[in-house]
Swiss-Prot record:
Protein name in UniProt: Aspartate carbamoyltransferase catalytic subunit
SUPFAM superfamilies membership: Aspartate/ornithine carbamoyltransferase
Function (record text): Catalyzes the condensation of carbamoyl phosphate and aspartate to form carbamoyl aspartate and inorganic phosphate, the committed step in the de novo pyrimidine nucleotide biosynthesis pathway.
Entry keywords, A to Z: Pyrimidine biosynthesis, Transferase
């Protein structure tokens, strides 16, 4: 598929070949970045970052990626600093911003907002998270992290832990992992199980899936444990949140009987689901994961801008 001008809205829009193109381009750009520091692929290009929802890693990672490519960045980190506060529609905001930029990255609390932005804009739009729906760039950096650690994605046993109902990162990741020969363990409280339609679709694609509420019973099997926080802001009422708050914590005790090769990932931010004492163990790679966001987003920006 032609990359120049392409939107990145959902991992469902990607084939396995598309994913591999992004991963191999990220690997190449990471090497070049480490050798040269500043690259010039995107010289003269402008990225607009439109964040209608809070973000630390995704926004800064995209900005860092664009600067590393030699481009520049405009945008806002919260809707209150834009004309949205005055009642401007998303459609008009997008049409305005595209006059100033070559590519748009958007995060929005409403599912489908990124797709709408892509339909309106004549320049590439990249989804940085739309509600509890999709977070495709996080998924790509997660896959890149796993491949860097293990040399492959095939043959691994991967556990997704925590908020599998509202967590957009795990929805996207599970769908992408269906392209690979992996066993997927879905570990969550009953109230926060992976949506049934996603599980059914994954099984139809031939994926082997184990669903459980008990982390301690399966953690010894895993090669990768992908931990997520309970997403308080997505719950319809606080009582439902309080029922599941603090359901799991990964600490040194629970790691006593795991594989030596187990790697623990987290899209961050974390609350209390991974104890800080785990950070110094060889199992923890969530800060490496943060770094990996830069070359992966460099790859996506370079590809959709048609500069690589």
């Amino acid at each position: 598929m032609e990359w120049k001008g392409r939107d990145v809205i959902s991992i469902r829009d990607f084939s396995k070949e598309d994913i591999e193109v992004v991963l191999s381009t990220a690997e190449r750009l990471e090497k070049e970045m480490k050798e040269k520091g500043q690259l010039e692929y995107a010289k003269g290009k402008i990225l607009a970052t439109l964040f209608f929802e809070p973000s630390t890693r995704t926004r800064l990672s995209f900005e860092s990626a664009m600067h590393r490519l030699g481009g520049s960045v405009i945008g806002f980190a919260e809707a209150s600093t834009s004309s949205v506060k005055k009642g401007e529609s998303l459609r008009d905001t997008i049409k305005t911003v595209e006059q100033y930029s070559d590519v748009i990255v958007i995060r929005h609390p409403k599912e489908g907002a990124a797709r709408l932005a892509a339909e309106v804009a004549d320049i590439p739009v990249i989804n940085a998270g739309d509600g509890s729906n999709q977070h495709p760039t996080q998924t790509l950096l997660d896959l890149y992290t796993i491949k860097k650690e293990f040399g492959t994605i095939d043959g691994l046993k991967i556990g997704l832990l925590g908020d599998l109902k509202y967590g957009r990162t795990v929805h996207s990741l599970a769908e992408a992992l269906a392209f690979y020969d992996v066993e997927l363990y879905l570990i969550s409280p009953e109230l926060l199980r992976m949506p049934k339609h996603i599980v059914e679709e994954l099984r139809e694609r031939g994926m082997k899936i184990v669903e459980t509420t008990k982390l301690e019973e399966v953690i010894g099997e895993l090669d990768v444990l992908y931990v997520t926080r309970i997403q308080k802001e997505r719950f319809p009422d606080e009582q439902e949140y309080l029922k599941v708050k603090g359901s799991y914590q990964v600490n040194l005790k629970i790691l006593e009987n795991v594989k030596d090769s187990l790697r623990i990932m987290h899209p961050l931010p974390r609350v209390d689901e991974i104890h800080p004492e785990v950070d110094k163990t060889k199992h923890a790679i969530y800060f490496k994961q943060v770094f990996n966001g830069v070359p992966v987003r460099m790859a996506l920006l370079a590809l959709v801008l048609g500069v690589i």
